[in-house]
Design a protein with these regions (language model features):
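An N-terminal, well-structured beta->alpha segment
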Residues: 1-25
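Flexible, charged surface loops at secondary-structure boundaries
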Residues: 20-24, 49, 82-83, 117-118
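Active-site histidine-anchored catalytic micro-motif
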Residues: 41, 45-53, 59-64, 68-69
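Glycine-rich beta-strand-to-loop/alpha-helix junction loops that act as flexible
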Residues: 27-35, 39, 58
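Short active-site oxyanion
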Residues: 25-28, 48-55, 100, 237
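Conserved phosphate- and dinucleotide-binding cores of soluble alpha/beta proteins
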Residues: 3-7, 11, 61-275
Length: 275
């Protein structure tokens, strides 16, 4: 089973790179997580000339992946002021039906958000299927809205910090997060009775003094933000999921259900759907 999952994650990465790595890119964002290891490997083995491409990491792990693959890293702060990333590849902890994501399990959420918002398009490669609604770290028992400083494990004493030396606070919520389409006059998604809509919650948390970034990636996609001539596209345009049965499921923004696009091995189209 574990081998099947790893094979599917690798296949998802290969499909994502094959379908979304642009011709002659200038800058490409590289996120973190187990699936992104395979994304970098797929880029390295693609045969594409990337000698003039700058790869922008979201954290220390990403930078090491880039360097170890023989690719050229460039720090986010070193980007020219007007430069956009042609594409950014990253993982996610949870993804809902509208491709809103929870990220930050690897403690890189601030840099991940900067990279996603600077990219023309954000492609998510994940190790699990889409869920109906974000559960806000639903592996924990809901405890209201009490924030908890994430504690280190055996390898690290004290609270977890980001690569920029900021504290990470996990805030479980009592109910799964609503989509905008779930909101009604009786359930506005503004926190009343513990029900939050994704974008309203992200905005409310961001307005708390001292909060630098929120691990909710929602709102417009990169193309939507560019079309509106605004900065801030952070929702992926597509998510590739490596499934336990060895298939790759693809979900695009605004798509009603995922398509099974590949099975590994070999990488061949199995079934697609049009909505």
């Amino acid at each position: 089973m574990a081998a099947d999952i790893e094979a599917a994650k690798k296949a998802a990465a290969i499909e994502a790179v094959r379908n979304h790595f642009p011709e002659n890119p200038r800058f490409v964002g590289i996120g973190s997580g187990t699936t992104i290891v395979y994304v970098v490997e797929a880029i390295k083995n693609s045969g594409i000339d990337v000698s003039r491409v700058g790869f922008v990491p979201t954290g220390y792990q990403s930078k090491q992946l880039i360097i170890n693959a023989g690719l050229v890293p460039i720090e986010f702060d070193a980007l020219p002021d007007s430069a956009m990333l042609d594409v950014a590849f990253d993982g996610a902890d949870e993804v809902d039906e509208d491709l809103n994501c929870i990220k930050g399990g690897g403690a890189c959420l601030y840099q991940e958000k900067l990279v996603a918002m600077r990219a023309k398009s954000f492609i998510c490669v994940a190790a699990r299927q889409v869920i109906q609604r974000l559960r806000m770290l639903g592996s924990r028992s809901p405890t209201g809205a009490t924030p908890v400083i994430r504690e280190g494990h055996m390898a690290k004493a004290g609270p977890i910090k980001t690569d920029q030396d900021f504290f990470i606070v996990d805030a479980p919520f009592p109910h799964p997060l609503l989509l905008s389409s779930d909101c009604t006059p009786e359930r506005l998604g503004n926190g009343e009775h513990g029900y939050w809509e994704v974008e309203q919650l992200a905005k409310a948390i961001k307005e708390i003094n001292g909060v630098l970034a929120v691990g909710l990636f929602c709102g417009p996609t990169g193309p939507e933000a560019l079309a509106a001539q605004v900065i801030g596209g952070q929702r992926p345009v597509a998510c590739y999921f490596g499934m336990a049965d060895g298939t790759v499921a693809l979900r695009r923004a605004r798509e009603k259900r995922p398509s099974i696009v590949a099975k590994y091995p070999p990488l061949i189209p199995v079934r697609t759907t049009e909505d």
